[in-house]
Regions:
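An active-site-proximal structural segment forming one wall of the substrate-binding cleft
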Residues: 94-119, 137-151
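Short connector loops/turns at beta-strand edges and beta->alpha or beta->beta junctions
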Residues: 45-48, 121-125
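Feature activates predominantly on carbohydrate-active enzymes
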Residues: 1-97, 101, 110-114
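C-terminal functional modules
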Residues: 268-372
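Short beta-strands and strand-loop turn motifs
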Residues: 82-84, 120, 158
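Short, histidine-centered active-site or binding-site loop motifs used for metal coordination
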Residues: 84-86, 122, 222
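Catalytic-core regions of glycoside hydrolase
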Residues: 12-15, 114, 125-268
Length: 372
């Protein structure tokens, strides 16, 4: 098996709103192996014992399932990272919280997890003024990671609270203090200049590289849609020429994410991204409306896009009513929402239909604007 700290690539189960079943996770690691990717990162925000109730132990049934998953992954040369996200309510003033953290990490390691990832993403700033040691938030997070690594007698990975340049506020010294105090053997996850960065080139890490020489893994949110659940991104793997030290955090839709892994594999091999769609049974009609499913940075590179309302509605009708597969069932709500939005934009919805498909306050506002 490849080292867990070099040339990492793979899948992050790290989104909001969805959580896989164990059979679905097994499907992902099989696809990772087929695509020559090597890592699965378990950190779903909706696992209560991962984040909100992080102090609580997992039950034996869940631990047995994780152990089986880790063993299956190891057999096909896939590493399993497991995250713990204590930052919402971790107390640096109570020793028993550190004891709880060690206990949880040891419990997860006992199942065969390759590495533990300590996560501080998506939490409010820690008010260090309440800490009697008067240490900065970045220093406290780094020292906690160091202490956990020492307690486990092994290197760990970490996600800092500031995990993208765009989260850096004026006079914010979090990253500087975090990186200055973090042990050099701890690997950092980072998203680059933006939470959804345009590329995964080394230049994306220029800011964080000013204050650290630690190994960095690029957390790629290109296909994530938990922040806009009415949309689906399934276009080309834009701005990425390689998939080393990069992990993708996509949708949580199993058939879609299996397709995305195919798409990435073909894209970084300079093959037409449509091959991935074809392999997964997507009809030709999808290419008439595919621009609506491209990643958000695509329009920045392609400002001139043609629209043909009637052809697009015709294609959507085919995809909605005649394309019937497991993948199409995942895409159905996104295709239908797109059709309704296009109809609304083209003034092609009557007031009765608007009342049916939009919440009452919105339907009233829309119909008032239309004069109906």
């Amino acid at each position: 098996m490849k080292s867990v700290t070099t040339n990492i690539n793979g899948y992050i189960e790290g989104y909001y709103g969805r959580i896989f079943t164990w059979p679905e996770r097994h499907s992902i690691i099989k696809k990772l192996n087929k695509c020559n990717f090597n890592t699965y990162f378990y950190c779903p925000k909706d696992d209560l014992k991962h984040r909100i109730n992080w102090r609580e132990d997992y039950n034996n049934q869940w631990l047995s399932a994780l152990n089986n998953f880790c063993n299956s992954a190891k057999e096909i040369n896939v590493n399993v990272l497991v995250g713990i996200s204590p930052g919402l309510d971790y107390s640096f003033l109570r020793k028993n919280d550190f004891d709880n953290l060690i206990k949880k990490a040891l419990q997860l390691k006992s199942t065969g997890a390759s590495k533990i990832v300590l996560m501080f993403d998506d939490i409010p700033p820690y008010r260090s003024c309440v800490d009697k040691r008067c240490k900065s938030e970045g220093s406290l997070h780094a020292e906690l990671a160091n202490s956990l690594s020492i307690a486990l007698s092994e290197d760990i990975f970490v996600v800092p609270r500031i995990y993208s340049d765009e989260l850096i506020e004026d006079k914010c010294t979090y990253l500087e203090n975090f990186n200055k105090n973090l042990n050099k053997n701890i690997t950092i996850f980072y998203c680059g200049k933006k939470i959804i960065s345009d590329t995964n080139k080394k230049s994306e890490l220029n800011i964080i590289r000013k204050t650290t020489s630690n190994h960095i893994i690029f957390w790629d949110n290109l296909y994530a849609n938990d922040y806009c659940p009415s949309r689906l991104f399934i276009g080309p793997y834009i701005g990425r020429k390689v998939f080393n030290n990069t992990m993708i955090n996509p949708t949580g839709l199993i058939k879609t994410d299996l397709l995305i892994l195919d798409l990435i594999k073909l894209s970084v091999s300079n093959k037409d991204w449509k091959n991935a769609l074809k392999i997964n049974g997507v009809p030709e009609e999808f290419y008439i409306i595919d621009k609506y499913f491209f990643p958000i940075n695509f329009l920045q590179k392609n400002k001139c896009i043609d629209f043909d309302y009637y052809e697009e509605i015709k294609a959507l009708d085919f995809l909605l009513w005649k394309w019937k597969t497991n993948l199409s069932r995942e895409w159905y709500p996104y295709l239908l929402i797109l059709k309704q939005n296009l109809q609304l934009l083209n003034n092609d919805l009557d007031c009765k239909r608007i009342k049916k498909i939009f919440p009452i306050p919105l339907s009233k506002a829309i119909n008032n604007q239309k004069g109906d």
